[in-house]
Design a protein with these regions (language model features):
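Non-catalytic, conserved peripheral segments adjacent to functional cores
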Residues: 20-129, 138-139, 145-146, 156-159, ...
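Positively charged n-region of N-terminal signal peptides that target proteins for export
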Residues: 1-4
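Bacterial N-terminal signal peptides
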Residues: 6-15
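Short, well-structured beta-strand segments enriched in hydrophobic/aromatic residues
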Residues: 149-151
Length: 198
């Protein structure tokens, strides 16, 4: 009798576990998209949800800007790449759930680096990646990961006139061999559909 009760409780517990969205599942990704009201980000790709901006202001080049703006950002298996773009503000990504994500950073001096946004610290991953303003960058969800939910802060705030999306042959030439992984083919993949003729 005790055996039957234990088995019954175990099966009930298993049913409960199976009914819950798993951390690596597409169901969990869809739940996050709906709950946080994320929408597809044009051109750059991925999912975006605007959280807000700071009430504190700064003046840069004679222009008043909020000290910071905050967003949710998400990559999924359907939209696994945040294509190459340049930002004037500092940009910091914090991994909330999922991942890992490879973060490609291209500095104004011609250096390139790849940092992995993730929770496996022993493997060299980091849960926070901070990118200085004036860099080019792209993010790609690692193979085997179903999604990555991040928060990002931009300082000063994001404005649409302080971003550039995509690049061309001259950019590819400049950053080719700037790191062992920076082949022309890999750089073109990071630019994706936003490759320009310039």
């Amino acid at each position: 009798m005790k055996y039957l009760i234990v088995v019954g409780l175990s099966l009930a517990g298993l049913t409960t576990v199976l009914a819950m969205p798993q951390a690596g599942s597409n169901a969990r990704a869809q739940e996050l998209i709906q709950t946080l009201k994320l929408t597809v980000l044009p051109k750059e790709s991925g999912y975006l949800g605007i959280i807000g901006r700071s009430s504190q202001m700064v003046t840069m080049d004679g222009r008043a800007l909020a000290v910071q703006s905050q967003n949710y950002y998400m990559l999924t298996r359907d939209l696994p790449i945040n294509y190459l773009h340049w930002l004037a503000p500092d940009d910091t990504h914090i991994l909330i759930e999922g991942g890992p994500v490879d973060y490609f950073i291209f500095h104004p001096d011609g250096r390139a680096e790849k940092v992995t946004l993730g929770m496996d610290l022993a493997a060299g991953q980091r849960p926070v990646v901070a990118v200085p303003g004036g860099c080019w960058k792209a993010l790609r969800l690692r193979a085997g990961a179903n999604y990555a939910l991040m928060a990002n802060t931009l300082s000063p705030e994001f404005t649409s006139d302080r971003v550039k999306i995509g690049a061309g042959a001259e950019w590819v030439k400049r950053y080719t061999n700037s790191a062992p992984w920076a082949t022309p083919e890999e750089l073109r993949k990071l630019i994706g559909p936003n490759f320009t003729a310039q």
